[in-house]
Amino acid sequence: MAHKKAGGSSRNGRDSAGRRLGVKKFGGERVVSGNIIVRQRGTKWHPGANVGIGVDHTLFALADGAVKFLTKDKGRSYVSVVIEQQTEAAE
């Protein structure tokens, strides 16, 4: 039996929704513990001081402070959270 697909049918026309990846908190921005700093696939950015990494390579703050991006050995980029010391005057 000869088979002929009906005309006008389209096999394409699908696309997946964007995954909303990227930097969520930029350098110098204040973060609190638990804030997501970067959503990524793989480790484009590596965790530095006071930054944790999730099973999906999401980087998040482990302490309150300011975000700092830096490049170290082998051209590897790191994200750290710099803790600001608060000097409270005792009255």
UniProtKB/Swiss-Prot annotation:
Signal peptide, first to last residue: none
GO annotation, cellular component aspect: cytosolic large ribosomal subunit
GO biological process: translation
Superkingdom field: Bacteria
Record-linked Pfam families: Ribosomal_L27
Keyword Ribonucleoprotein: yes
HAMAP family linked to this entry: Ribosomal_bL27
Identification of the protein by name: Large ribosomal subunit protein bL27
Species this chain originates from: Methylocella silvestris (strain DSM 15510 / CIP 108128 / LMG 27833 / NCIMB 13906 / BL2)
